[in-house]
Each structure stands twice: as structure tokens, then as C-alpha cells.
A protein has these predicted regions:
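Canonical Rossmann dinucleotide-binding motif of NAD(H)/NADP(H)-dependent dehydrogenases/reductases
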Residues: 1-29
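A conserved structural motif in NAD(P)-dependent oxidoreductases
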Residues: 15, 227-238, 249
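Conserved glycine-rich Rossmann-like NAD(P)H-binding loop of the short-chain dehydrogenase/reductase
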Residues: 24-40
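Rossmann-fold cofactor-recognition segment
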Residues: 45-63
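Conserved NAD(P)H cofactor-binding loop of Rossmann-fold oxidoreductase domains
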Residues: 82-89, 100, 126, 263
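Catalytic loop of short-chain dehydrogenase/reductase
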Residues: 89-91, 118-191, 200-205
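A glycine/serine/threonine-rich, flexible loop-to-helix segment
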Residues: 136-147, 203-226, 267-275
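Short, small/polar-rich loop/turn modules that mediate ligand/substrate recognition or access, typified
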Residues: 194, 253-255
Length: 275
């Protein structure tokens, strides 16, 4: 008897916390561009009783994504997809961040939308950073939402000369993620499936520690110190929301984004410094 297949892209703490909640009894494909990262998460899952396999995937490559999907389909129908892959502003160049976080996510949503089973669901991890980007025009939002993935990086607003730095590239990518989820949810609905995004704030993971200990470290520490929650978040707190979105309890939720940042974005716009 074939199992359902659950695919995780991005072998990190948030992704692992989510699959531990939702994927017991399924065949889990843990994909990462660094195979050793996928193997480490897979080992932890297997030792906890899960059926998991590691897979090397470059999400900036459509062919690599399709290869992952084909492998998962051999195990069973793909019932859930969790995308927790991405690069932070301190980890790479503007161009690479856009290729992975923006283009890669757009392709993932498109390709998994073609194969997700009826009743299936997906979550992609975006970021609070996209909520801090000043409002774009209605036309810019439409282009980010609906431009075919192979044409996305040719848009004027995504040309290198129009992007200030890696943080700006990251913010645009995360804004695009949310808009793509909205547009893709309409197509996913035709298959009886759902897709949503989660925009976490500072969650203690190796990726976040790169930022906290990087050149913008003081900015991030000050940010969560001034937030209503007064602290950084935990991966399990993101998984709490993902579990709802991937379950039948979230059956009426699709095309939505959930900001989980301890109120940091609220403080950014409306805190004491802005009164």
C-alpha cells in the first residue's frame, strides 16, 4: 500500500518542526541544496520513528524541482508540501537571493500545484521583512503575483540596478512570495487543494543567528526587544500555525499570509519611536 508523500524543501529547524507535527505515517522527502543538511534532518526524523529520505535539490532550478517531484510521486500521492528554503540577506548576493527566494518559490508553487492531491495543502515560509517593504503599486503587485516564473526576473522592479542591497532583494522576494500564494491559491483550488504562507519574525534558527551575529545584528536585537512580545520566536511557534493550515481545521483558509513576529512589525510602524 502506497503512503502519501510529504515534501519539505529547506532542511532547517522550522521545516523539521512542521513535518514532525503533520507527516507521521507519510513518506517524507527532505530536500535541500546541501545534501548533508537534508541528511542531518532526515537522520533526526528517522530516529524519531518517521519514514524520511534525503534529497539534493536546487530550488533555483526548475529541472531540479521536477526531479524531486517525480521521486516523491513514486512514493505516493503528494498530500502536503512545506517550503522552508531560502537565503537571508547576509548569506548571498542580490541576484542569488532573487533566484532562490523569489524565482525558486514561484516555480515550487507552480510545479507542486500541478501534482498536489485533492484535499492536499501547502505552506511556504515567507518573512516579516516583506511586510516592511513600502507599498508597491497595484500594477507591481499584479506583476509579482501573475508573471510567469521564467519572466519574473526580467521585470523592471527586479533589475539589479533598481535593487539597493541584499535586504531590499530579500524584501521584494518575500513580498512576491505572498502575492504568488494568493494567485496560485486560485489554481490550487481547481484541484481541491490549498496553499498559504507564513511570515515569521526573528525565529531562533541557524539562519536567524547568521543575521543576529552579522552586520545588521544590533538592528535585529533592538527590533525584538521593542516588540510587544519582547523576544525572538521559536520554530515550534511557527509550526503551531502551519499545523492548522495543513489540517482539516484550516479547510477554509487558502491564499492567505500569517504574520507571526511577536508584534515586531506593529512596533515598527506604530511603536513609541513612531508616535
Amino acid at each position: 500500500m502506497q503512503k502519501n508523500a510529504v515534501v519539505l524543501t529547506g532542511a532547517g529547524q522550522i521545516g523539521m518542526a512542521i513535518v514532525r507535527r503533520v507527516a507521521y505515517g507519510s513518506k517524507i522527502f527532505v530536500a535541500d541544496w546541501k545534501l548533508e543538511n537534508a541528511q542531518a534532518i532526515t537522520k533526526t526524523l528517522v530516529e524519531a520513528g518517521f519514514d524520511a529520505v534525503a534529497f539534493k535539490t536546487d530550488i533555483s532550478s526548475r529541472s531540479s524541482i521536477i526531479e524531486l517531484i517525480e521521486a516523491a510521486k513514486h512514493a505516493g500521492e503528494i498530500s502536503m508540501f512545506i517550503n522552508a528554503a531560502g537565503l537571508s540577506p547576509s548569506q548571498s548576493t542580490k541576484e542569488h537571493i532573487l533566484a532562490v527566494d523569489l524565482y525558486g518559490t514561484a516555480v515550487l508553487l507552480e510545479e507542486f500545484g500541478k501534482v498536489i492531491k485533492q484535499g492536499g495543502a501547502a505552506v511556504t515560509i515567507s518573512s516579516q521583512s516583506g511586510h516592511r517593504l513600502p507599498a508597491l503599486t497595484e500594477e507591481a503587485d499584479r506583476l509579482l503575483a501573475t508573471t510567469p516564473p521564467e519572466e519574473l526576473l526580467k521585470l523592471d522592479l527586479l533589475r539589479s540596478e533598481n535593487i539597493r542591497d541584499t535586504l531590499h532583494a530579500y524584501q521584494l522576494a518575500k513580498r512576491c512570495n505572498v502575492k504568488r500564494v494568493m494567485a496560485e491559491s486560485v489554481k490550487w483550488g481547481e484541484r481541491g487543494a490549498r496553499v498559504n504562507s507564513i511570515s515569521p519574525g526573528i525565529i531562533i534558527t541557524p539562519l536567524a543567528l547568521d543575521e543576529i551575529n552579522g552586520p545588521r545584528g544590533d538592528f535585529y536585537k533592538n527590533m525584538f526587544a521593542k516588540s510587544p512580545a519582547g523576544r525572538a520566536g521559536m520554530a515550534d511557534e511557527v509550526a503551531n500555525v502551519a499545523e492548522l493550515l495543513l489540517s482539516e481545521k484550516g479547510a477554509f483558509i487558502t491564499g492567505a499570509d500569517f504574520l507571526i513576529d511577536g508584534g515586531a512589525t506593529a512596533a515598527y510602524f506604530y511603536g513609541q519611536d513612531n508616535r
